[in-house]
Amino acid sequence: MGFDEKREPTGGRLRLQDIPALTQDHCRMRDPAEVERIINEFVIGGPERMQIVSDFDYTITKQRTEDGGAVPSSFGIFNACQSLPENFKAETDKLYHKYRPIEIDPHMPIAEKVQYMIEWWTKSGELTSGFPFDQSEIDQIASKYTHALRDRTHEFFADLQRLGIPTLVFSAGLGNSVVSVLRQANVLHPNVKVVSNFLQFRDGLLDGFQQPMIHTFNKNETVLNETSEYYDLVHTRDHIIVMGDSIGDADMASGVPASSHIMKIGFLFDHVEANMKKYMDTFDIVLVDDQTMDVPRTLLSLIEKQHKLNLEAPKQSSL
């Protein structure tokens, strides 16, 4: 049965003004009425129609820590491994300092950025070839940064597991690092799937990354094989929360049916004023320097509250 626009949550239509997490100064919206509409659709649809699609670097992890310490990217964790060749870090640093400014440049069109991202990932793959590597080193480095997940991330992932909501972690970074951090932080639950760039080996030596290459501007659900187990799990779930920290992340749900209801949440930290308009035009909710999972958790709590009311209603009517 399709969504009935006239239906409302059992307790009445939810209003943004009654949801404290969404009325704070750092929580910006281009179209509050649209956000309110989507929230009500999510709440009516319940957890069985939900899925989450999230970036990893600086989305699940913080963009800054309270003590000012740096949070490495998933590739940064790999680059910190001691057994890498001496020139490896220097060469990857050169690539980072060349291409990262392009990735976050608020003035360059995305179509132009794509070619640079392909260059970056291709050159990174070429550097990551021809030497032995023990993957347990990634675990050793990753263990130091499990504290760098956004505040209340553990609770957020526990909520998702409890509600049976499939969660796709989509990363243009290094999947081996992503999996290691999530596993050691005890949030890699059975409902969580990681799609990313994973190391591959040939004859005991590193041989770049497995295909397909996933960069900032091509990661979306169209890369999920229609015969895959995860595709079977989510292709009927048409209520989607998308979370990311870069403009390209907003397209991670591309490939889902046009009838889907999608809430896009953007975490903005770099070049706030210069990026604000683009983020506001791209995301439904823009969170400025918010290092928590409070807003997505709030959405889940609203969905769960209505779900419980729905479960209780038949019991009450039978009394």
UniProtKB/Swiss-Prot annotation:
Reported effect of changing F75H? Increases KM 3-fold for m(7)GMP and increases KM 10-fold for CMP. Decreases KM 6-fold for m(7)GMP and increases KM 2-fold for CMP
**Record's keyword terms, sorted:** Hydrolase, Magnesium, Metal-binding, Nucleotide metabolism, Nucleotide-binding
Indicate yes or no for the key word Nuclease: no
**Named cofactor requirement(s):** Mg(2+)
**Do you know which InterPro entries this protein is assigned to?**
HAD-like_sf, HAD_sf, Pyrimidine_nucleotidase_eu
GO MF annotation terms: 5'-nucleotidase activity; magnesium ion binding; nucleotidase activity; nucleotide binding
GO CC annotation: cytoplasm; cytosol
> Regulation of activity: what does the record state?
Inhibited by high levels of AMP.
Listed binding positions for substrate are S171, A172
EC assignment: 3.1.3.91, 3.1.3.5
Where, by residue number, is the active site? D55 (nucleophile), D57 (proton donor)
Q: How does activity depend on pH?
A: Optimum pH is 7.5.
The family line of this record is: Belongs to the pyrimidine 5'-nucleotidase family.
Q: How does it assemble?
A: Monomer.
Q: What does this protein do?
A: Specifically hydrolyzes 7-methylguanosine monophosphate (m(7)GMP) to 7-methylguanosine and inorganic phosphate. Also able to mediate hydrolysis of diphosphate (m(7)GDP) to 7-methylguanosine and 2 inorganic phosphate with lower activity. The specific activity for m(7)GMP may protect cells against undesired salvage of m(7)GMP and its incorporation into nucleic acids. Also has weak activity for CMP. UMP and purine nucleotides are poor substrates.
Descriptive protein name: 7-methylguanosine phosphate-specific 5'-nucleotidase
Tell me which species this is from.
Drosophila melanogaster
Supply the gene name: cN-IIIB
